[in-house]
Amino acid sequence: MSEIDAKGGIPCPYPPKKIIQVPVVIGKGEKQYLVVKEDCISPPSPPVFRIVDVDKEVVVTDAKLVPSVKYDSSDKGGKPWCLSKVIINGYIDKNVIYKTIKDYTHEDVNGPLFQFTTRVPFSTFLEIETQEKIYDTDKVEILSAVVEGEKEELFDPNPVPKCAPDWAVTYNKILEKILIRICAKVVRIEELKVQPEW
């Protein structure tokens, strides 16, 4: 049996449509960025003999959407397209576990493990290409932010102690080269009418 319309007493074969809000993906983009930083291992921390392990995490602290610019390009099949930018700020939280030299003979060395933790700030931007204009009311979401590769170089060596092996060199500085990849998307909240079931 159909329900009765409360206002006019007329049978209502379908329930009224409802409006829902859904996030719609307008576009996606990604960026690779090389971060270079020089770290100094200063007293009371001992100098570095060898790096044992490195833990790292990319943290995005802020993402700002820049309004888009519209283009007409023949290489897009004559269709208009928009290019927007996202300004990104963040840091890389990095922990280095390293060996140092405390005692030595003319053939070998020994010493404890130490850890060195630092935060490497970065600022960059990525581009997002869309088929429609992006507005200030649209939102940007970070899909992923990861370290894709890294390299640590030891430099600023100390003199080798007398009677120690010639390879027992410790270093006061680390040059860090970190390649990060950030992926983001732009979403817009749109209203849709749906027909609920009985």
Would you name each region that the model predicts?
Residues 1-198:
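Viral structural modules
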